[in-house]
Amino acid sequence: MKKPYFVSITLFITIAVLILDQVTKAVIAKSMAIGDSYTVIPKFLYITSHRNNGAAWGILSGRMSFFFIVTIVVLGLLVFFYIKEAKGNFLMQVAISLLFAGALGNFIDRMLHGEVVDFIDTKIFSYDFPIFNGADSSLTIGVILVLIALLFDSRKSKV
């Protein structure tokens, strides 16, 4: 039986997530000054305008050339992995689409603005989690789905 690629679905997911990410960042950048914050759910969720020229928690701040190179390599590896390993695995294809969209979304910010627009600000059990954006969420969900897909794949091979 021929294993399919779900190209139209994965392209739709990638493009939709990328557009949503870029539009939300543009709205925040245009309508809020850096540091402005609005409460969505008191003591839990805020929209806070923030800029980050590093990775999560400001790691490697100001190392744009490093991020450019790493992102290009990662995007290439994701395409390779999609073609070579994800055939017939719908969940893995969705996961790779989310990873690709997230990496590309933050890459676009770094290329155009030299920094990433972050705005989702959460406090979980009094821990003030680092401010993040839609691309970061896409990357996180993509990683979780890759792990789930690999778990299911390893279980199938044992049966």
UniProtKB/Swiss-Prot annotation:
Highest taxon, organism lineage: Bacteria
Pathway given in the UniProt record: Protein modification; lipoprotein biosynthesis (signal peptide cleavage)
UniProt key word Iron-sulfur: no
Cellular localisation: Cell membrane
Residues the record marks as active site: 118, 136
Broad class of where this protein is predominantly found: membrane
Ranges that cross the membrane: 4-24, 64-84, 88-108, 131-151
Enzyme Commission (EC) number: 3.4.23.36
Group of enzyme by EC: hydrolase
Keywords for this protein: Aspartyl protease, Cell membrane, Hydrolase, Membrane, Protease, Transmembrane, Transmembrane helix
InterPro entries attached to this UniProt entry: Peptidase_A8
Annotated GO CC locations: plasma membrane
UniProt-recorded Gene Ontology molecular function terms: aspartic-type endopeptidase activity
PANTHER family associated with the record: LIPOPROTEIN SIGNAL PEPTIDASE
Name of this protein: Lipoprotein signal peptidase
Lineage: Bacteria, Bacillati, Bacillota, Bacilli, Bacillales
Gene: lspA
